[in-house]
Every structure is written in structure tokens, then in C-alpha cells.
Amino acid sequence: MTNLLINVDHVGTLRNAREETFPDPVHAAARCEQAGADGIVFHLREDRRHITERDVRLLAETVNGKLDFELSTEEEVVSICCDVVPDLATLVPERREEVTTEGGLDVTASRPRLNAVTDRLYDAGVDQVSLFVDPVPAQIEATAAVGANCVELHTGDFAEASTEAARREEAERLAAAADAAHEAGLRVHAGHGLDYNNFSLFRETVPHVAEVSIGFAVMARAILVGMDQAVRDMRATVANAQP
């Protein structure tokens, strides 16, 4: 079965919008795990717009399942990741002006730096290192060449497709990328924009997906039905959509 990791960034977004101490991403993570999540994802951005270093260290101490630390290659953030040693480190692109991550890494253009950071993460004791990339063959090949043992496929174009035909076309593109990643020996992860409505088509079409990261859809639903129910609903969606 595909593992479900819940991203708690937007709990921090809500907290920080009022410069409050609540809601707490650490408490939210515990509720997500209690409701059936296989693990927790967070992105420590350079500008600390949602998750803070305090959150990171408490999540590292309290999460019982898998912990996925999303990060750029910025030196301070890499050092923090090496210090807390998550189960998985996912390298992502980052621009201060973006609202959310807008696309995958250009691994082919950044191989020396990505190679150095990947090696450093392994040396620190991180078991899995993943690169977040668009479903493009050249990026899959470069991910393997850099030394990562996982790849996270960017599903944003699939999620944002305006027609059913376009969405199916993007699903097939993701399927080809997943096949290529599997052939290259990479563990396949996926995320960005996956939700209760589009996940079935995604999973029925795209093979080899060991793990998905879903955040915004779950947090938005939690406002209406509560965190426990939102996570349980997503857990059921993932379980029922196996190929």
C-alpha cells in the first residue's frame, strides 16, 4: 500500500498569520498520526514563513512514523537537517516570492551542489534522500546520477489540469516518469496538489508509487470536519485507490 505522509506547513501558516503560539504544527502532527497518517512532512523555508526551527526540533523528537524534512540547498537549513537527521530529506527548489513550490528542481543545471548536499545528508545519517522534480526523463536520470535514492514526482500539472483529457495526459506523463525512476533504482514518491478528488486517477495510472505527500487538501478539509476525520478520509482515499 502507498504510504500517506501529511504536510503540516499550513498549520504554521495559520499560526504565524496572527503571530500566535497556536495552532501548533507539532500538536497537529500528533493528531495526524493518531488518525492514521504514516508520517509527517514539513518544509523549513529560508524565510521561516510557516515552520520554524523550534517546530523542526520538536517534530524530530515526537513524530513516531516517518519524518520528511523538505529543504533547499541553503547552508543553514542543510546544517539543521543534518543535525536532526530525519528519516527522509527531500531537496526542493525555493524562491522567496512564490506562494508555494511552483515546480521541480532543475537537477541537470545544479548537479555539483545537489551532489554535495546529498552526500552530506547521507554522511549525517539520513537514510533516504529525495529530489523533487518534474516528470521529465532528463531530470530522473540526473537525480539518479546525483546519488539520491528516492525521487518525488511533482504532480502539480496533473492536479491543475483544466480538462479531464489534459489530466489524463499528465497522469500518463507521470506514469512514464515513475517507470523510468523505478528502472533507475529510485524509490518513487509523489506530491503537490493531490487531493480527495484527483487521487484515484493518479494512483490508478501511475505505478511504483511508494509514498505520497499531501498537505493543503487535508488542512482545508480539516477546517470543516476536523483533523481526525480529514486524515481518515484521505487515508481511505489512498487505500481505495491502489492499482
Swiss-Prot record:
Catalyzes the complicated ring closure reaction between the two acyclic compounds 1-deoxy-D-xylulose-5-phosphate (DXP) and 3-amino-2-oxopropyl phosphate (1-amino-acetone-3-phosphate or AAP) to form pyridoxine 5'-phosphate (PNP) and inorganic phosphate. The record marks E152 as: Transition state stabilizer. It is an enzyme of class 2 (transferase). Keywords: Cytoplasm, Pyridoxine biosynthesis, Transferase. This is Pyridoxine 5'-phosphate synthase. Homooctamer; tetramer of dimers. The active site is at H43, E70, H192. The keyword Cytoplasm applies. NCBIfam families: pdxJ, PRK05265.1-3, PRK05265.1-5. It holds the Pfam family PdxJ. HAMAP family: PdxJ. It is found in: Cytoplasm. Pathway: Cofactor biosynthesis; pyridoxine 5'-phosphate biosynthesis; pyridoxine 5'-phosphate from D-erythrose 4-phosphate: step 5/5. GO terms for molecular function: pyridoxine 5'-phosphate synthase activity. One of its GO terms (cellular component) is cytosol. It catalyses: 3-amino-2-oxopropyl phosphate + 1-deoxy-D-xylulose 5-phosphate = pyridoxine 5'-phosphate + phosphate + 2 H2O + H(+). The gene is pdxJ. SUPFAM superfamilies: Pyridoxine 5'-phosphate synthase. One of its GO terms (biological process) is pyridoxine biosynthetic process. It comes from Salinibacter ruber (strain DSM 13855 / M31). It comes from the Bacteria.
